[in-house]
């Protein structure tokens, strides 16, 4: 799993400037895409992070360490510099 977490952290690119906000939950998510065509959504409740990924036709969930999750959110905030929107789903 460590290789998957490293790939998410190093190779993931933000698909757009939208923060996903599901109805009636306290979760927020970011869409990530990868060069080989895989996709993930990085979810957080403010304390814990996990990624729900689709790769090679399979869906799987990966727990993300807080330090890496915080770093990905910080990169998102720096990239879009407050120019992001919420997507209610």
Roles of regions detected by a PLM:
Residues 1-89:
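Function-determining sites in protein domains
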């Amino acid at each position: 799993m460590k290789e998957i977490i490293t790939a998410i952290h190093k190779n993931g690119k933000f698909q757009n400037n939208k923060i996903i906000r599901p109805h009636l939950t306290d979760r927020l998510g970011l869409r990530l895409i990868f060069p080989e065509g895989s996709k993930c959504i990085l979810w957080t409740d403010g304390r814990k992070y996990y990624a729900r990924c689709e790769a090679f036709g399979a869906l799987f969930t990966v727990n993300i360490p807080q330090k890496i999750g915080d770093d990905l959110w910080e990169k998102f905030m720096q990239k879009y510099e407050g120019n992001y929107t919420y997507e209610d789903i």
